[in-house]
Amino acid sequence: MRALGGALALLGMVALSAPAIASDREFAACLQQLRSEAATKGVSSATFDQHTAALVPDMAVVGFLDAQPEFVTPIWDYMAGLVDAERVADGRAMLERWAEVLARVETQYGVDAGTVVAVWGVESNFGRNFGSRPLLTSLSTLSCFGRRQAFFRGEFFTTLKIIQEGHVAPERLTGSWAGAFGHTQFMPSTFMRLAVDFDGDGRRDLVDSVPDALASTANFLKRAGWRGDLDWGFEVVLPKRFDTAGAGRRNKQTMQQWASRGVKRVDGSALPAAATPAGLLLPAGAAGPAFLVTRNFDALYAYNAAESYALAIAHLADRLRGGAPLVTPWPTDDAGLSRAERREVQSLLLARGHDIGEPDGMIGARTREALKQVQGELGLVADGRAGQAVLKALRDAESR
């Protein structure tokens, strides 16, 4: 029986390793094909050989192409985590630290310091989180496997050109699984089009040069249509029985037209008497906060095509400039948590014996599974969501 068990185990190892062997062979063949195209993409054979010789595929990134989120984040959770007291304080410190650079950036590109720093804060938490996946590994894998190979081949060759031109050292090029990197998370192709050398050292470096990263971000927004004489928008109040059929950031009317329909700023004051086009944004429906948004909001949307993302950047920028929190509450009886509160939830889960790793404020799969169990034990809906209700229940249970 022992011999049979060993044989079965060996067969299992062979079966498990066969796909990996096949992947390695496919990858090697794919790299040879890519090498034959390199010169036409502006990449020398020497550069290609030097930086691909030791590459092995990371098949995990292929799975991300079609991965469906197991947990859809409500906007009140998204905003609570991205625009919290911690990020506002850190952002204001960065405004002070980089004031001279930001003033020059605004003069040259017409994008205010608060907006640039808000992008920085959301994209990498002010340089604390670039992403840990080596770009050449991820992009070469995605160039050879899965959907969108043509797109990722372009990003792969562009990454090699970035290295070849001496902008960023290859070992410093780590980022997201899809290839975004640096302080403000540019894709390689975006880097080539829009990154600038703002510190004057002859390199465009979004990893080790904060001035280059901030100026490149402003250049992106300017090219996306940002106007320095215009707000991104602001929170508004709608009159009762307001017809929201025409809501949407693309369905723009002038401020005068919105005013004629009874729309006011959230403090009750009248809208600007201007012909400025603006769309009505209702990110949580008619029961939640409402905003009039201008072309500058569209420029933020161009940075990352999600309205919740653009709103987080816009609101964080307002808070960095001394603005107040949103006035209208989100339509929920279980509001979202700041990162500090998320870490507290994780600490309380650890105290109850759940092995979820160090508290980091990131609500991942292990934290959600632990939350489901605890929610069931505490009489809450076991959905794995980290909100104020489960935080209160955990605090109460801890104090008993």
Cite the ranges covered by each PLM segment.
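Low-complexity, glycine/alanine/valine/leucine- and proline-rich hydrophobic stretches
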Residues: 295-296
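Bacterial N-terminal signal peptides
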Residues: 5-17
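Intrinsically disordered, low-complexity Ser/Thr-rich linker and spacer segments
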Residues: 394-400
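N-terminal mature-domain "stem" immediately C-terminal to a signal peptide or N-terminal signal-anchor/transmembrane
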Residues: 23-57
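Catalytic glycan-binding domains that act on GlcNAc-containing polysaccharides
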Residues: 43-275, 288-291, 300-317, 321-339, ...
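N-terminal secretory signal peptides that target proteins for export/translocation
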Residues: 1-2
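Sec/Tat signal peptide C-region and signal peptidase I cleavage site
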Residues: 18-22
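Short acidic, glycine/serine/threonine-rich helix-capping segments at coil-helix boundaries
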Residues: 337-342, 350-394
